[in-house]
């Protein structure tokens, strides 16, 4: 049970856990088993065995919206782990208990498979939850893609095989990951794959564990824009085959250097996904092409299964039985055996598409008619793809991080149907009497007296800047809005801080502070509308001067 009034989670809501194999490997009797629901509140089942005091905590090696992952060393065994520390107060406040449980329960179900990051313990104190995880010291797949741009064919083949093997095991246990991407694929000390981040996984009911890959289940929009499958966009459903779509996207990115479906905003990405608009470089190994043509299909039932993928020519040299005991090939760049130059790829960068924008766009996209895309895809035996020499120009990551719920789809109902939301982000709004003298932003003691209110800022394609809050019964409404194209509206960005800006109209002034601490991701969009207002005002002034001269 949750004590919402005092922002507490009882221990029965998130019972502790210890991996049985952890004790058996040491010849110990495991006094703790995965917990049932009849737990006495306020007690810790393994508190006497493991607690924060049993570890030496080191550097932060990862963080999320309500958790941090720290490198830690067991004081008795001196073995290193990655401990995920979660804030209980935030979990309750943001209704994340479900997702915390999903992550723990998924990892408990998958524990022991070599391609899945292992959960050894969970324990807690009054303020925090602790997940003791297997340490993956060699980082994530994305960093190697960034470093080498195009991975060697042998690397791609071996790691694609390990990822596929891990997906096969997940599905056999009734787990759909729903957010497979290079950031969630780690490497252990021997450079073998470790899939992690199960906070948005879907745990299937027992009767559906062995269901066909194309069986669909209702799903909210979770995941990452560049890797989501068409069925999530069109019908708000997910299947085991959705993970295989994402798998194909990851393999493509390993060998090409960028995701197959990318764009400047979520809508562009989703349109490309639904129309199967992707390209293949001319230097791509011919054996790998069927992997993409058989997985990039609109209908889940038209995609190849895991067993069929294993039989593709690209994996002909893979020995599946001892895959996890083999020595991985050295990580290196692709080196063609023939004298064809690979053009220089532009520098890698992350897109400015926010998680909120991706969720909003997905909601809008799902409501649009896409039947024509599906009918076209059904008539095609194989999708038509273009072949080109140069790698794709750029790619980005519109990421919905683990445990982060998508922005409420009702946001789109708050603006006229003729407008599109091009940016949505969490901000703090502080009303002030007027623009500070000399355009100086408050600092020091004066900042303490500002009344900050957390809101969601929506920016539309016509220059509307609206601030949304929740009323009674969780009803969303626009508390205030300004027209950035209005010549009476003043927008000033703080030259000394990248996290805030100021808006003033004829009546009121507000300081807007971005929750993430970075307003640069949408600064240009706002200034573009403000420039339009300035040009209109300038033309109006010139016309008045001309009229006065004629008089």
Curated annotation (Swiss-Prot):
Its EC number is 2.7.11.1. Pfam families: Pkinase. GO terms for biological process: intracellular signal transduction; positive regulation of attachment of mitotic spindle microtubules to kinetochore; positive regulation of mitotic division septum assembly; sphingolipid mediated signaling pathway. ATP binds at residues 65-67, 84, 134-136, 140, 183, 197. It is found in: Cytoplasm; Nucleus; Cytoplasm, Cytoskeleton, Microtubule organizing center, Spindle pole body. Residues 86-131 are annotated as: PIF-pocket. It catalyses: L-seryl-[protein] + ATP = O-phospho-L-seryl-[protein] + ADP + H(+); L-threonyl-[protein] + ATP = O-phospho-L-threonyl-[protein] + ADP + H(+). The active site is at 179 (proton acceptor). It comes from the Eukaryota. Residues 24-43 are annotated as: Disordered. One of its GO terms (cellular component) is nucleus. Residues 55-315 form the Protein kinase domain. GO terms for molecular function: ATP binding; protein serine kinase activity; protein serine/threonine kinase activity. The modification Phosphoserine is found at residues 220, 538. Its main location: cytoplasm. Gene3D superfamilies: Phosphorylase Kinase, domain 1, Transferase(Phosphotransferase) domain 1. Keywords: ATP-binding, Cytoplasm, Cytoskeleton, Kinase, Nucleotide-binding, Nucleus, Phosphoprotein, Serine/threonine-protein kinase, Transferase. SMART domains: S_TKc. The PIF-pocket is a small lobe in the catalytic domain required by the enzyme for the binding to the hydrophobic motif of its substrates. It is an allosteric regulatory site that can accommodate small compounds acting as allosteric inhibitors. Belongs to the protein kinase superfamily. AGC Ser/Thr protein kinase family. PDPK1 subfamily. This is Serine/threonine-protein kinase ppk21. It comes from Schizosaccharomyces pombe (strain 972 / ATCC 24843).
């Amino acid at each position: 049970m949750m004590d919402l009034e005092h922002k507490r989670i009882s221990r029965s809501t998130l019972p502790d856990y210890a991996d049985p194999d952890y004790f058996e490997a040491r010849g110990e009797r495991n006094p703790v088993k995965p917990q049932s629901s009849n737990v006495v509140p306020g007690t810790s089942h393994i508190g006497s065995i493991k607690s924060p005091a049993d570890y030496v905590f080191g550097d932060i090696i990862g963080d999320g919206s309500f958790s941090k992952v720290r490198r830690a060393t067991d004081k008795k065994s001196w073995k290193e782990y990655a401990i995920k520390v979660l804030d209980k107060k935030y979990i309750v406040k943001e209704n994340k208990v479900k997702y915390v449980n999903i992550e723990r329960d998924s990892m408990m179900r998958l524990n022991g498979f070599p391609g899945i990051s292992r959960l050894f313990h969970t324990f807690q104190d009054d303020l925090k939850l602790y997940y003791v995880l297997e340490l993956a010291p060699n980082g994530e797949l994305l960093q190697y893609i960034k470093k080498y741009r195009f991975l060697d064919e042998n690397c791609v083949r071996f790691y694609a095989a390990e990822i596929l093997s891990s997906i096969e095991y997940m599905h056999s246990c009734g787990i759909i990951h729903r957010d497979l991407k290079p950031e969630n694929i780690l490497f252990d000390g021997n450079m073998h794959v470790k899939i992690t981040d199960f906070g948005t996984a879907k745990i299937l009911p027992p009767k559906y564990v062995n269901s066909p890959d194309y069986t669909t289940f209702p799903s909210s929009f979770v995941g990452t824009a560049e890797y989501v499958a068409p069925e999530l966009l069109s019908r708000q459903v997910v299947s085991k085959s959705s993970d295989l779509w994402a798998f194909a996207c990851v393999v493509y990115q390993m060998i090409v250097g960028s995701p197959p479906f990318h764009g400047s905003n979520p809508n562009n990405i989703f349109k490309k996904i639904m129309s199967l608009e992707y390209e293949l470089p001319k230097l791509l190994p011919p054996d790998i092409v069927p992997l993409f043509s058989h997985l990039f299909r609109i209908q889940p039932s038209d995609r190849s299964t895991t067993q069929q993928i294993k039989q593709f020519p690209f994996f002909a040299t893979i020995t599946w039985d001892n895959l996890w005991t083999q020595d991985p090939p050295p990580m290196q760049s692709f080196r063609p055996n023939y004298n064809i130059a690979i053009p220089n790829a532009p520098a890698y960068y992350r897109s400015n598409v926010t998680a909120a924008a991706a969720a909003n766009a997905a909601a809008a996209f799902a409501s649009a008619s896409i039947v024509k895309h599906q009918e076209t895809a059904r008539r095609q035996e194989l999708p038509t793809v273009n072949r080109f020499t140069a790698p794709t120009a750029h790619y980005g990551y519109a990421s919905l991080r683990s445990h982060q719920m998508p922005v409420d789809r009702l946001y789109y109902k708050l603006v006229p149907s003729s407008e599109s939301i091009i940016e949505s982000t969490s901000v703090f709004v502080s009303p002030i009497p007027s623009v500070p003298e000399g355009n100086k932003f408050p600092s020091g003691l004066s900042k303490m007296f500002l009344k900050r209110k957390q809101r969601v800022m929506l920016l539309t394609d016509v220059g509307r800047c609206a601030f949304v809050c929740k009323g009674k019964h969780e009803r969303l409404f626009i508390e205030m809005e300004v027209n950035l194209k209005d010549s009476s509206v003043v927008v000033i960005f703080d030259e000394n801080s990248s996290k805030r800006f100021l808006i003033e109209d004829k009546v009121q002034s507000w300081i807007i502070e971005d929750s993430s601490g970075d307003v640069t991701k949408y600064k240009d969009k706002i200034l573009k509308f403000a420039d339009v207002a300035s040009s209109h005002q300038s033309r109006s002034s010139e016309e008045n001067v001309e009229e006065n001269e004629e008089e």
